[in-house]
């Protein structure tokens, strides 16, 4: 009985090993570069696009649908012309998608609805904060002082810096 069970265990381990990978498509790209960022080619299109700052999962699905790409398809399986189409669409700031899906609505200078990605988003957010500081809005003043901006409590939470400790009265 001992030998028979040992043989079964061995065969179970062999059965648990994953099957050898099938021959991969020669055109498969393991790294796809979009908006100056390397994306993992083994991920589905919306998930890979969500690695870009400024594009979430929902926007990734919307972009795939807009470009007639199958959302379950891996981004590395796309042809060169499809990748170029995707690059142009992502790097274009004005999307033909619903306004609520975009991250920079009613831009102050032009009034357009934009979706910014990567460094464009970082630069624009910093410019918006500097504008608030310049016009001395409540939020701008809070930013200047390094306080919380969105109405959170400041008395008990969010403390940082060195603790002062308790000072005793001198007798």
UniProtKB/Swiss-Prot annotation:
Q: Which GO terms describe its cellular component?
A: cytosol; small ribosomal subunit
Q: PROSITE patterns from the xrefs?
A: RIBOSOMAL_S13_1 (PS00646), RIBOSOMAL_S13_2 (PS50159)
Q: Does the keyword Protein biosynthesis apply?
A: no
Record-level GO BP terms: translation
What GO molecular function terms would the record report?
Answer: rRNA binding; structural constituent of ribosome
InterPro entries named among the record's database cross-references: Rbsml_uS13_C, Ribosomal_uS13, Ribosomal_uS13-like_H2TH, Ribosomal_uS13_archaeal, Ribosomal_uS13_CS
Q: Which Pfam families match?
A: Ribosomal_S13
Return the similarity comment: Belongs to the universal ribosomal protein uS13 family.
Protein purpose: Located at the top of the head of the 30S subunit, it contacts several helices of the 16S rRNA. In the 70S ribosome it contacts the 23S rRNA (bridge B1a) and protein L5 of the 50S subunit (bridge B1b), connecting the 2 subunits; these bridges are implicated in subunit movement.
Q: State the name under which the record lists this protein.
A: Small ribosomal subunit protein uS13
| Biological source species | Thermoplasma volcanium (strain ATCC 51530 / DSM 4299 / JCM 9571 / NBRC 15438 / GSS1)
